[in-house]
């Protein structure tokens, strides 16, 4: 290619018959040639860079930079699975009851029932009438879009009941509470035929309405899929929960202590050990104030020796020490307001100075949006408890069971399930000086070897008394490899 210099080409300049101008003009002509050569090279390289910028070069550069940037989910999400093609037999409307984790398990069960019966499921309504009086809707706690999309290949889920089926338009819903601990035959033989006469059925209760055992492997694994994949907290809750975990982990390993010594638990169970007479009377009045709490007259000490009461904060101190936890152990209290306030936590703080709660780790403005929303607060505790190095519940309630199962699913993370019946016996023997401290500590450790550390094990099955069986969500063995 010739490069033009004025009216001459480079080839003309190189001809042997060409008479050069006076010597003083030669350096200027050569400078012009080299100038245009350099410009041409720059132009070519610029074009090449533009061509490859968004492919190899750019990709390599951004990959290199990303190593030093904050962890961000850069992997694209897989496309949503295609919806399952089925003719719906009707619409299932569900009202959940109880606290966050009781409702969580119930949602998993109701998705499974909808799949079994080929129903369209309306996003479940959360409990707003119980003791906690939390006004949160499903989408305030869980990522509703993810819930619907992630399960679309199994169940058709809609956000709300179509208007034509609402009371406002004169439609009368058929309401029923399913029988507790029911198997697939109950739903196929007793519930499904009702949809031939009614387009919509409303389940007014949802707690423990599906059996722990005896279901097909596909149904059991669907329960797990909803629990571990379909039910994801909102980005706001996930972000703050992750921040709590990050703060705790930066300070070292930590124990999540689910100290279930809260007013609702004590009033419901009738457990008043360690309370004053005035506090015991306050708890009794509260129990009578809630008509759906069936038991009213409860003898606290009888309940306690049967292992049916949560440990008091003072009892928890002795048990933690006996299990070998040192004074410098970082302990996160996964609980709401402790009954009796700061005075009941005094011994715990004295024995383990590194006691923390979410209110101590976060700025008040960060928690302000969660105030008066106990289920959203419980979601934060759930995230921290699942992530903890060791999880210890002082009462084996719904949160303890669901967190235990989640930790098993994540690789059998250490979970100490306290044998409260045995512990009460040992605590009383130690407190009345029958057992020395060393004897007490050895006995406590011996009582928690084997099945009580979250190791792999099979669920205990008692078909005639399903309430006494091991809970499916505490040990979803069908889903753990």
From Swiss-Prot:
Glycosylation sites per record: 85, 118, 372, 432
Highest taxon, organism lineage: Eukaryota
Gene Ontology cellular component terms for the protein in this record: chloroplast; Golgi membrane
GO MF annotation list: glycosyltransferase activity
Pathway listed: Glycan metabolism; pectin biosynthesis
Cellular compartments annotated: Golgi apparatus membrane
Keywords recorded for this protein, A-Z: Carbohydrate metabolism, Cell wall biogenesis/degradation, Fucose metabolism, Glycoprotein, Glycosyltransferase, Golgi apparatus, Membrane, Signal-anchor, Transferase, Transmembrane, Transmembrane helix
Primary residence: Golgi
Reaction catalyzed: alpha-D-galacturonosyl-[(1->2)-alpha-L-rhamnosyl-(1->4)-alpha-D-galacturonosyl](n) + UDP-beta-L-rhamnose = [(1->2)-alpha-L-rhamnosyl-(1->4)-alpha-D-galacturonosyl](n+1) + UDP + H(+)
EC number: 2.4.1.351
Membrane-topology annotation of the record: Single-pass type II membrane protein
Enzyme class: transferase
GO biological process, any: cell wall organization
Residues bound to substrate: 258-260
TM ranges: 33-55
Family the UniProt entry places it in: Belongs to the glycosyltransferase GT106 family.
Function comment: Glycosyltransferase involved in the formation of rhamnogalacturonan I (RG-I) oligosaccharides in the seed coat mucilage, which is a specialized cell wall with abundant RG-I. Transfers the rhamnose residue from UDP-beta-L-rhamnose to RG-I oligosaccharides.
Protein name: Rhamnogalacturonan I rhamnosyltransferase 4
